[in-house]
Amino acid sequence: MDIKNSPSSLNSPSSYNCSQSILPLEHGSIYIPSSYVDSHHEYPAMTFYSPAVMNYSIPSNVTNLEGGPGRQTTSPNVLWPTPGHLSPLVVHRQLSHLYAEPQKSPWCEARSLEHTLPVNRETLKRKVSGNRCASPVTGPGSKRDAHFCAVCSDYASGYHYGVWSCEGCKAFFKRSIQGHNDYICPATNQCTIDKNRRKSCQACRLRKCYEVGMVKCGSRRERCGYRLVRRQRSADEQLHCAGKAKRSGGHAPRVRELLLDALSPEQLVLTLLEAEPPHVLISRPSAPFTEASMMMSLTKLADKELVHMISWAKKIPGFVELSLFDQVRLLESCWMEVLMMGLMWRSIDHPGKLIFAPDLVLDRDEGKCVEGILEIFDMLLATTSRFRELKLQHKEYLCVKAMILLNSSMYPLVTATQDADSSRKLAHLLNAVTDALVWVIAKSGISSQQQSMRLANLLMLLSHVRHASNKGMEHLLNMKCKNVVPVYDLLLEMLNAHVLRGCKSSITGSECSPAEDSKSKEGSQNPQSQ
C-alpha cells in the first residue's frame, strides 16, 4: 500500500466537537516515519492507510463468509485483523526447557510438550468463573461452590480479617499482628505464596496478606453485619440459580439476548464506565534505574492489572453468558493489548511520557536501561500521539477497549452446539459495542462522512496496538528466558499460554506427517478431553 500518496484529507484529523460529551505478531513491519523515532518527544500526526476503507463499506465477500446475505452491521470484523495467538490450553509452570534444549522437528517437539506439561488453567478459570451460580447438582457446601483463600488459593474456611482465607493463613495473620512480625525474606521479597509454598517465607506471606486486603479491624463487631448481608446474598443467589434451572434450555439464551438488545447505546456506555478498573499503585524503582529494577516494577504492575482486567471483563454486559472456554480464550488473546490501551489512555495528555501508574511515570529515555524496550516505548508513544491527534474521548476509549477484548479471537476451536451458540452470542455482543461506539461518534455533531472517517481512523489504529503488544510479549518472554526478572502467578500463566500457542502455530505452518496432522485436528476439536 502506498502510504505517501494518500489524499491530503487524511493528513489532518477532522474537527471534533467534544462539548456535547455527557460523561465525565507476530514479526512484521510497521510504517513509522523517521520523525517518530528520533530523540524528540512530541510526534506529529502520521497517515496510516489509503482512503479505500474510509467509507467503512463492507466487501461483498464478507456477507458470504458470514453465512449468506443479511442485515449489514457496523462490526469492524473486516477492518480489524484477527490475531494469531489462540491458546487452547494453559500451563501453570515455567517452560524453561523450551529455551534450554536444542531445536528439533517442530511437530515432534510440540507433541512431547503436550505430553509432559500439566494442562492447568485453574488460576484464570477460577477468577473468570468466580461469581457464577452453583451447579444444581452440587450442594452449597461442595468444593465446586467454595470460596478460595485470597493469600494462598487454598479452599477458604470463611471470611477472616476482611477477606476470604483458609484456616492456616487466618491463624498466621493473627499470630503476626499479635506478636512479633519482623520477618526477613531470605530472597528478593518476591516469593510465590501458594498452597504448597505458603510456609516457605513468612515475610512474603505477611506481605501478601496485606496486599490482598487483610486488616486488623476484622473483628466480631463487623462479623454480625457481614453475616446478615452474606445470608441475604446467598438466599438471593439460590433463588436466582433455582429460577435459571427451572427455565427451559431454549428460553434462557433468548431472554438474555433480549436484555442485551434492551440496552440502549447510552446505557451500554454507562455500564462500561462503571466497569472501569481502579488505578493500580506501584512503587517507582529507586534511581538509578537498572534493567532488573524496572522490569520488576513493570511485571508486578502487569500482574496486579491482570486481576482487575478479569473483573472488568466480567462486568461487560453479556460476557459472562459466553462459554467459560470462550471467556478464557478471549482474555488470553488480548490481555497485553488491553493493558497497553489503558497505558495509552493514561498517557494521552502527557506528550513524551508513559503513565504506567500514577506513581510510575517514565520518559522515553528512561527505557534505555532495559535492552530492547526502547523500540516498544517508541511504538507506544507514536500510537498515543495519533490518538491525541484524533482527540480520543473517554467514551470512545471505553468502547474501543471492550472491542479489543471481544474481537481478539474470532475463530473457535470446537464445533459443539454450546460453543457455536457462544460464538453467536459473542458476535452479537461485539455488534452491540460497535453500535455504541457509532452512537458516541454521532453524538459529537460532526457530519455523516466525518463520522465514518473517524470510526475508520480509530479502528485502524488498533492494528498498531496489536503490533506493539506482540513486541511487548516477545520482549517479556526474552527477559524471562534470560532470568532478568522472575514471573509468577497469573502473568506467568498468560505467558505460558502464549508460548504454547507459538509452538502450535509453528506446527500449523510446517510440514507434518498426515498421521500427526489428523491427531492435531482431533485434539483441537476436543480441547476438554486433553
Swiss-Prot record:
Q: Which disease is it linked to?
A: Ovarian dysgenesis 8: An autosomal dominant form of ovarian dysgenesis, a disorder characterized by lack of spontaneous pubertal development, primary amenorrhea, uterine hypoplasia, and hypergonadotropic hypogonadism as a result of streak gonads.
User: One GO MF term, please?
Assistant: zinc ion binding
Identify the taxonomic lineage of the organism of origin: Eukaryota, Metazoa, Chordata, Craniata, Vertebrata
Give the protein name, as stated in the record.
Estrogen receptor beta
Q: Which family does it belong to?
A: Belongs to the nuclear hormone receptor family. NR3 subfamily.
UniProt keywords (A-Z) are: Activator, Disease variant, DNA-binding, Lipid-binding, Metal-binding, Nucleus, Phosphoprotein, Receptor, Steroid-binding, Transcription, Transcription regulation, Zinc, Zinc-finger
Post-translational modification here is noted as: Phosphorylation at Ser-87 and Ser-105 recruits NCOA1.
Q: What does this protein do?
A: Nuclear hormone receptor. Binds estrogens with an affinity similar to that of ESR1/ER-alpha, and activates expression of reporter genes containing estrogen response elements (ERE) in an estrogen-dependent manner.
Q: What is the effect of changing S87D?
A: Abolishes repression by activated ErbB2/ErbB3
Residue numbers spanned by region Modulating: 1-148
Instruction: Please give the Pfam families that the UniProt record associates with this protein.
Output: ERbeta_N, Hormone_recep, zf-C4
UniProt GO cellular component terms: chromatin; intracellular membrane-bounded organelle; mitochondrion; nucleoplasm; nucleus
Q: Per its UniProt record, what InterPro entries does this chain match?
A: ER-beta-like_N, ER-beta/gamma, Est_rcpt/est-rel_rcp, NHR-like_dom_sf, Nucl_hrmn_rcpt_lig-bd, Nuclear_hormone_rcpt_NR3, Nuclear_hrmn_rcpt, Znf_hrmn_rcpt
Boundaries of every NR LBD domain copy: 264-498
- Quaternary form? Binds DNA as a homodimer. Can form a heterodimer with ESR1. Interacts with NCOA1, NCOA3, NCOA5 and NCOA6 coactivators, leading to a strong increase of transcription of target genes. Interacts with UBE1C. Interacts with AKAP13. Interacts with DNTTIP2. Interacts with isoform 4 of TXNRD1. Interacts with CCDC62 in the presence of estradiol/E2; this interaction seems to enhance the transcription of target genes, including cyclin-D1/CCND1 AP-1 promoter. Interacts with DNAAF4. Interacts with PRMT2. Interacts with CCAR2 (via N-terminus) in a ligand-independent manner.
- Zn finger (NR C4-type) ranges are 149-169, 185-209
Phosphoprotein recorded as keyword: yes
Region listing for Disordered, in residue ranges: 507-530
Organism, per UniProt? Homo sapiens
